[in-house]
Structures are given as C-alpha cells and as structure tokens.
C-alpha cells in the first residue's frame, strides 16, 4: 500500500494594517484572538495551547505569554494598529492589556470592556466551599 503524502498548507500572508485584539479572560484560562476590522480571525492563542496546564493557565504570566504569541503571529500579516476588547473576570486580563501596549511596533487605538452583565438573568453558580 502506498503511503500518502502529507501536504501542509502554506500560510497566506495578508497585508492588514489595523485589527482588533479580543481578550477573553475566564477563571480557568485566557484566550486571545486577533481579527481584522471585519471580524475575520488572523491569529489566536491561549494559555492552555501554550503548554500551561491546570491552575497555571489562569495566571497573569500565562495570559501575557498568550498575548505575545498571538501578536507575533499577527505581525507576520502586517498588523500595526490594534484596538483591544476585553471580556471576562479572569486574573490575566490586566496583564494581557498591559502586554499589548508594551509590544514593539504595535499602536493601541482603543480599549473597551465587553463583559456581559446579567440584569437579573440566570441564577449564578453556588459559592465554593473549600
């Protein structure tokens, strides 16, 4: 039986100057997605995807590494200006925003909190007893 050749797709580099960085900081993980202005994903990263496991995924350092990884991937597509949209109550949200601002060659245009707030909607989960 003949072996199949594995064909790897080439990354098509797009020239996109402006984009939006979505930071979703949950209690367990931090996910970062870089999109163009229309909302099409260019690059993404997460703390768990970088090898952080268990409770280490929710640390501020893991969030910083996830942001740097996603923005380095996005820089290959020519991103120079980004807006930041932050969602969630996680511990990595402040560090993630700071590390976007500290990235060389990337200018931050706006910062917006898009955390959904319930107006007496669903009942929240019960309190933890440790």
From Swiss-Prot:
SUPFAM superfamilies: Translational machinery components
InterPro entries (alphabetical): Ribosomal_uS11, Ribosomal_uS11_bac-type, Ribosomal_uS11_CS, Ribosomal_uS11_sf
One Gene Ontology cellular component: ribonucleoprotein complex
GO biological process: translation
Domain of life: Bacteria
One example GO MF annotation: structural constituent of ribosome
Keywords: Ribonucleoprotein, Ribosomal protein, RNA-binding, rRNA-binding
NCBIfam families found in the cross-reference section: PRK05309.1, uS11_bact
Oligomeric and partner information: Part of the 30S ribosomal subunit. Interacts with proteins S7 and S18. Binds to IF-3.
Protein family membership: Belongs to the universal ribosomal protein uS11 family.
Function: Located on the platform of the 30S subunit, it bridges several disparate RNA helices of the 16S rRNA. Forms part of the Shine-Dalgarno cleft in the 70S ribosome.
Name this polypeptide is given: Small ribosomal subunit protein uS11
Species, as recorded: Campylobacter lari (strain RM2100 / D67 / ATCC BAA-1060)
Lineage: Bacteria, Pseudomonadati, Campylobacterota, Epsilonproteobacteria, Campylobacterales
């Amino acid at each position: 039986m003949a072996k199949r050749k594995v064909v790897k797709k080439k990354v098509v580099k797009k020239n996109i100057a402006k984009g939006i960085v979505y930071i979703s900081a949950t209690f367990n993980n931090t996910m970062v997605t870089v999109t163009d202005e229309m909302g099409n994903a260019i690059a993404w990263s997460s703390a768990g995807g970088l090898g952080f496991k268990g409770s280490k995924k929710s640390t501020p350092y893991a969030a910083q590494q996830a942001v740097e990884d996603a923005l380095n991937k996005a820089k290959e597509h020519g991103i120079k200006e980004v807006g930041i949209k932050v969602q969630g109550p996680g511990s990595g949200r402040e560090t993630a925003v700071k590390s976007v601002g500290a990235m060389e060659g990337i200018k931050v245009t706006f910062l917006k909190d898009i955390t959904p707030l319930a107006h007496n909607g669903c009942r929240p989960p019960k309190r933890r007893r440790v």
